[in-house]
Amino acid sequence: MMNWDRIEGKWKQLKGQAQQQWGDLTDDDLDRVDGKREELVGVVQERYGLAKDEAEKQVQQFESSCNC
């Protein structure tokens, strides 16, 4: 979670990476997220019909892999 401040600050650049990881997310979804971690978890959960803990896990993996 320490990286999240950096992710939030670079969200415009990282939206593409997020879209690669979650291809079902729309540009509107990603704009709505606007770098907010909880919002991303919610959108991933909603789009993919996941349990909150699974969505959290995926966002954590994204956080680890984004090289921020």
From Swiss-Prot:
It comes from the Bacteria. This is UPF0337 protein RB10934. Coiled coil: none annotated. InterPro entries: CsbD, UPF0337_stress_rsp, YjbJ, YjbJ_sf. Belongs to the UPF0337 (CsbD) family. PANTHER family: UPF0337 PROTEIN YJBJ (PTHR34977:SF1). Pfam families: CsbD.
